[in-house]
A protein has these predicted regions:
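A short hydrophobic/small-residue beta-strand
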Residues: 33-35, 313
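Rossmann-like NAD(P)H-binding beta-loop-alpha module
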Residues: 54-135, 142
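Glycine-rich phosphate/pyrophosphate-binding beta-alpha loops
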Residues: 227-229, 233-239
Length: 376
């Protein structure tokens, strides 16, 4: 009834319920303006809904859909509009950042911290969307649309969660001077696509992103004119979300008072929109952790396998021997290599008769953000 009431000019959808897509579509079809915090609807149905809003002369605003109280959507659409966005690195999910912060502090393992996060209300009873990385992927798809003119949904970009991160990974990262965070990354590729991916990554411990703690979010954008811009704040919660929703409502009211036209046009992508690139074409540094038999020639074979796929080793650390099992833990850090080659090499290493279990692979991002010293 509200949607078709002639006295209603703006429909605000904050339910997060499954029918939300239908309600938003119906409201736009009726010529209403819509404000929503529903990232899934915007990420998965944006093409259709933005085109519909433009056709019907309405508007669709969604500041609260990404990073809660951080005004990242409006900053990209207006404040940074004169820039070509070169890259974006972000911590976009408060639940996983809270969990990784606690695990990094040594306050428990994955299962313990997840249970604590659920008890405190930071994680849903079913935490899959958060811990799998899909929540961050949907947010990155939205940011990719605005910042990079990229077309695609959260399901179209590479997504890996934190479910398999172990305390031993965190300790190994610390010894190397790194901290593990769930990162959302987007950047241009040489062939006109957009490299967009969400996964755990090792970032230098002195970097700003490594020092974003608990449920807070942060986004670093490199613009062609402004250089590095860092946005930081509460990524979720009742009041930050309400702040973003009200800001959208105020913007709509200001437009109506001034007679300004809808601003939806920049969200409707044309034939020149860039697709998301395949992660297998990405060139990244890698951390590998494996347990192998303690015998001569093992490291030489592993080195040869990596070399066969044109993967260069930056450093190797061998831990003390497990006296009971007769195995040792090897940690290998590589120089930049193509993801496709790395996956092939890891599969070959895991197939060797002296390798025990699966090799742990974590991507490394050294060029993420300025250090704390540079910020100060």
């Amino acid at each position: 009834a509200v949607i078709h009431d002639d006295n209603v000019q703006v429909v605000v959808e904050l339910t997060g319920a499954a029918p939300a897509y239908g309600w938003i579509k119906e409201a736009l079809s009726a010529g209403k303006d819509v404000v929503t915090a529903n990232k899934a609807v915007i990420a998965e149905h944006g093409d259709e809904l933005f085109a519909l809003a433009q056709d019907k002369g309405g508007d669709l605003l969604f500041e609260a859909a990404v990073a809660g109280g951080i005004p990242i959507i409006r900053s990209l659409r207006s404040g940074l509009v004169a820039n070509r966005v070169e890259s974006l690195y972000g911590i976009l999910n408060g639940t996983t950042n809270y969990m990784m912060t606690r695990m990094t502090r040594g306050e428990g393992d994955y299962d313990e911290i997840l249970a604590e996060a659920q008890a405190k209300g930071y994680a849903e009873p079913d935490p899959t969307m958060d811990v799998s990385g899909m929540d961050a992927a949907q947010k990155l798809a939205i940011l990719g649309r605005i910042a990079f003119h990229a077309t695609g949904t959260g399901s179209d970009l590479f997504c890996e969660g934190i479910e398999n991160i172990q305390s031993s990974d965190i300790e190994a990262a610390r010894e190397l001077g790194y901290t593990i965070k769930l990162l959302a990354i987007a950047k241009h590729t040489a062939d006109g696509k957009v490299e967009a991916r969400v996964h755990p990554a090792m970032v230098p411990s002195e970097s700003l992103l490594a020092n974003i703690h608990d449920e807070f979010n942060a986004i670093e954008i490199v613009g062609s004119a402004v250089g590095n811009q860092v946005f930081y704040g509460a990524g979720a919660g009742q009041m930050p979300t309400a702040s973003a929703v009200v800001s959208d409502l105020v913007e709509l009211a200001q437009r109506r008072n001034t007679g300004a036209t809808t601003a939806i046009g920049d969200m409707v992508l044309d034939d020149e929109a860039a697709p998301f690139a395949d992660i297998e074409d990405s060139i990244i540094r890698y951390f590998l952790r494996m347990r192998v038999a303690d015998r001569p020639g093992v490291l030489a074979q592993i080195t040869q396998l990596l070399a066969t796929d044109e993967i260069s080793i930056a450093s190797v650390i061998q831990k003390e021997r497990d006296l009971e099992g007769g195995t040792v833990q090897l940690i290998i850090v590589t120089h930049e290599a193509r993801e496709r080659s790395m996956r092939k090499a890891v599969a070959a290493i895991d197939a060797l008769d002296f390798t025990e279990g699966a090799t742990r692979l974590i991507r490394m991002e050294d060029q993420t953000c300025r250090t704390l010293g540079e910020i100060e």
